[in-house]
């Protein structure tokens, strides 16, 4: 099995829809084994000089999201290629996983 992780900004749009909602609907329609969307609570990127954490006085300018999904390797690669035809942003990584 292969797991894919898609890292995007929460407020990023695909046409008029939130990108993470579009991706989740896309994965559901593609009948992947399972997918989950997570909202980031802390993080940093290449240009940051400190950790970013939202609180009462501060919120992320671009809150991070991670969508992860798992399926057979061929299916994951096919779905990623189809997704990349729809949007070029974000970061997509994959890793082999073992189901227990």
Model-derived regions, located:
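Positively charged, small/polar-rich N-terminal and surface patches that mediate targeting and assembly
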Residues: 1-100
């Amino acid at each position: 099995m292969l797991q894919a992780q898609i890292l995007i900004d929460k407020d990023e749009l695909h046409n008029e829809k939130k990108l993470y909602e579009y991706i989740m609907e896309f994965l559901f329609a593609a009948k992947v084994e399972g997918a989950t969307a997570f909202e980031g609570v802390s993080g940093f990127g290449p240009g940051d000089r400190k950790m970013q954490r939202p609180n009462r006085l501060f919120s992320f300018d671009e809150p991070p999201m991670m969508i992860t999904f798992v399926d057979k390797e061929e299916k994951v690669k096919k779905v990623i290629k189809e997704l990349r035809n729809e949007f070029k942003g974000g970061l997509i990584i994959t890793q082999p996983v073992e189901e227990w």
